[in-house]
Amino acid sequence: MTVMSDTDALEGLEPTETIDVKKVFGLDTKMKVKGFKTGTEYVPEIDEAYRFDPQTTLAILAGFEHNRRVMVQGYHGTGKSTHIEQIAARLNWPMIRVNLDSHVSRIDMVGKDAIVLKEGVQVTEFREGILPWALQRPVAIVFDEYDAGRPDVMFVIQRVLEASGKLTLLDQNRVIAPNPSFRLFATTNTVGLGDTTGL
């Protein structure tokens, strides 16, 4: 497991490498996308045996290349998150996955005040949550089980789905603009409408 840290191996990284989609993903297309020259601890491992669904792959690649929010829908266990992960691995794109189960709260997403020791003295300091941390870095964040997210969490995510993608931290009187290489993806089973079985 990779731990998010304040010491930043991601600082200054940009996707500068041109990647030939036909060569890397085996798809019949002339599409080229940008990726990172080298990987970091946040880049998923490549599964050489993974086979890409062409239509889904092109949609995800468009999300990476053109900074578009992409939601992948499908049944449980069909590899939605793995699909995004394996594309990120081949682009050397740092990625984190967040499962939006009932245990993920607004505080986890935004951050909270914490008591820390500084020079032997206890002080209160704001600790960024998952979303501000990722938003400021060249990271692809994947929200798994998007349709299962709690309402308070979904309101936080809603703001970064918009065109400018800025996140306002009211408690900190701060507005965070996204890193140019920040990307957002989601996976879902139902798209909020139930599925073909009526569940």
Can you say where each PLM-predicted feature lies in the sequence?
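AAA+ P-loop NTPase catalytic core and its hallmark functional loops
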Residues: 2-199
